[in-house]
């Protein structure tokens, strides 16, 4: 399926076929993954090994000590807990993680006797076949009023393209009210908020990096709640849901009208409360007063069963597939989608990368000319760091805010350092590209790891706090190598707040300084991984996390390898264009 058909039955059949195909491929890949030895699963980031059982806490969670979590497993993830001497595995959830300890909440109650042998434990990511939930939503779609009158017309491009007279009037009132708040909002932010408040059916807000998308979302939710609406905030990930709800809760300022629904995980001083079921929450007794609930689309079946919403707000909609979005949209009649199709798209394993974008709800509705606004002022990127993404992803329309444009690195540059280090840390060089001549690196590069660690040490001793910098890399192996190198250069406590992770983990985050280590250089490997390495959306995310300085470490062979595919060559050219915008140096000089 590359685009939606204008025939409703074909739309639904295409989506149903995609759901079934995706579930089958996921099932096969998971079986192949679990057939691998533990050490290979650890390398892939799907397993955390060498767990040592310490205790059962008062909530029944098993608490384990570990040597460091280099996996992609995080709080809220479903896992299987296994032991090297046992075949059986236990289903559970990562309830909490702190430093070198991890809490596992079981599906069934743990018994102390299960942990007679304290060492030898490991956790793997779990697989759940959720296709029945998707198929159930698609089955309901053509037979219900919301499906027939609200959702299918959107997917088929039959919704009204402009505002009607009533919407126009409401838009003008909302816009004028925002304009009276002197200096609070940019023009396109006011347009987005007014559009969301006025529209009767659907509105899209595209939020390029650092443009205040979440701030706009929170204001919209507050105003909807103030006029008595029941609002659902949902997203593809728990992190995105929590982030959006926290921002909305700050705006609303009334804990009794805000609730998060889902299985309990550890919360850290949140400004909202969590409940397992709607009936347990204060929302159930709010009557006609507006409120906001936040949950995954899957929670609507049991935790929020029978609850009708006025407005469905989908955050990070660029990452949500259309079937998952439909599951949420069936619970309400108005849809506000916040996202950016130029950043990371949906996670899909059954289709080639270039087909995945069309499977996302944000991309699909943009193609159907749904009413939309693109926020065009970034508060994150300075003037130099804004130029490249603006020209290559946002039609030259993205510009830095007045306060962000002149922002530069302010830490002291050590005068005794090598010339290449001075160039790298120079405040007047916000974008730096460090050339390397290694030629045999795949998923890790010792040269780049050593240089990245040296730069971090220099920044740290120049006064930059660890939490103000991060390292982004395509491969977990490189992240591990950089951490190990840092362990030899700095006391462990001094860089605890430093994030070293993959692009996927950094979407939505920002730091003053970002190091991007691309590491790959072996020609055959670069060709094999070209779709992944040169993915424009991943590159856009990686290049737009920094507020004041982006430092890219890459082998010259990454850019000179001939790919013999016109599409991939275009994407390789995009990376070359980023290098052309940079101050270029080399640590081999």
Which positions does each model-derived feature cover?
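N-terminal pre-P-loop "Q-motif" helix
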Residues: 181-201, 216, 295, 447
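Conserved helicase motor core of SF1/SF2 NTP-dependent helicases
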Residues: 226-229, 235-239, 298-589
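A helicase ATPase "motif cassette" and its flanking acidic/Ser/Thr-rich regulatory loops
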Residues: 1-74, 98, 102
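Walker A/P-loop NTP-binding motif
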Residues: 201, 214-229, 247-249
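Conserved helix-turn-beta segment of the N-terminal RecA-like "Helicase ATP-binding" lobe
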Residues: 239-270, 484-493
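Inter-Walker segment of RecA-like/P-loop motor cores
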Residues: 251-301
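Pre-ATPase regulatory/linker segments immediately N-terminal to the P-loop/RecA-like helicase/translocase core
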Residues: 5-9, 70-194, 255, 261, ...
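Hydrophobic anchor at the beta1->P-loop junction of P-loop NTPases
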Residues: 205, 233
């Amino acid at each position: 399926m590359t685009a939606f058909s204008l025939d409703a039955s074909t739309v639904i059949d295409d989506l149903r076929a995609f759901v079934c195909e995706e579930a089958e491929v996921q099932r096969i890949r998971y079986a192949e993954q679990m057939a691998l030895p533990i050490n290979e699963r650890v390398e892939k980031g799907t397993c955390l090994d060498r767990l040592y059982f310490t205790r059962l806490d008062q909530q029944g969670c098993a608490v384990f000590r570990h040597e460091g979590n280099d996996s992609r497993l995080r709080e809220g993830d479903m896992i299987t807990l296994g032991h090297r001497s046992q075949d059986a595995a236990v289903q559970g959830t990562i309830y909490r993680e702190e430093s070198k300890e991890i809490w596992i909440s079981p599906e069934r109650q743990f018994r102390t006797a299960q942990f007679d042998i304290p060492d030898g434990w490991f956790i793997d990511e779990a697989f759940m076949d959720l296709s029945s939930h998707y198929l159930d939503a698609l089955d309901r779609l053509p037979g219900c009023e919301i499906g027939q009158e609200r959702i299918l017309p959107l997917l088929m491009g039959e919704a009204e393209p402009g505002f009607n007279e009533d919407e126009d009037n409401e838009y003008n009132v909302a816009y004028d009210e925002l304009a009276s708040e002197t200096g609070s909002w940019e023009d396109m932010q006011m347009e987005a908020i007014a559009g969301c408040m006025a529209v009767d059916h659907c509105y899209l807000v595209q939020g390029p990096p650092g443009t205040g998308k979440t701030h706009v979302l929170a204001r919209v939710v507050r105003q909807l709640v103030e006029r008595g609406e029941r609002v659902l905030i949902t997203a593809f990930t728990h992190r995105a849901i929590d982030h959006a709800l926290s921002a909305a809760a700050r705006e609303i300022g009334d804990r009794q009208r805000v609730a998060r629904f889902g299985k309990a995980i550890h919360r850290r001083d949140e400004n909202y409360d969590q409940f397992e079921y709607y009936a347990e929450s204060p929302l159930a007794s709010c009557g006609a007063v507006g409120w906001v609930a936040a949950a995954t689309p899957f929670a609507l079946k049991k935790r929020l069963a029978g609850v009708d919403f006025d407005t469905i707000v989908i955050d990070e909609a660029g990452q949500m597939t259309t079937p998952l979005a439909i599951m949420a949209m069936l619970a309400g009649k108005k849809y506000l989608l916040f996202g950016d199709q130029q950043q990371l798209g949906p996670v899909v394993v059954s289709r080639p990368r270039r087909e995945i974008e069309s499977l996302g709800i944000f991309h699909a509705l943009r193609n159907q000319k749904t009413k939309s606004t693109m926020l065009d002022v970034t508060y994150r990127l300075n003037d130099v760091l804004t130029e490249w993404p603006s020209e290559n992803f946002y039609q030259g329309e993205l510009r830095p805010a007045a306060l962000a444009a002149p922002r530069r690195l302010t830490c002291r540059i050590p005068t005794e350092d090598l010339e290449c280090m001075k160039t790298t840390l120079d405040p007047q060089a916000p974008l730096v590209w460090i050339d390397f001549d290694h030629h045999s690196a795949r998923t890790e590069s010792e040269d780049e790891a050593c240089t990245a660690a040296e730069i971090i040490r220099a920044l740290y001793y120049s006064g930059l706090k660890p939490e103000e910098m991060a390292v982004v890399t395509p491969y977990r192996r490189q992240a591990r190598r950089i951490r190990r190198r840092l362990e030899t250069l700095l006391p462990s406590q001094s860089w605890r707040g430093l994030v070293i992770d993959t692009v996927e983990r950094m979407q939505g985050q920002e730091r003053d300084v970002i190091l991007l280590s691309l590491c790959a250089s072996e020609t055959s490997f670069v060709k094999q991984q070209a779709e992944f390495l040169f993915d424009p959306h991943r590159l856009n995310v990686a290049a737009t996390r920094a507020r004041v300085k982006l430092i890219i470490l890459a082998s010259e062979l990454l850019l000179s390898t001939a790919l013999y595919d016109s599409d991939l060559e275009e994407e390789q050219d995009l990376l070359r264009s980023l290098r052309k915008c940079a101050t270029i140096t080399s640590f081999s000089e």
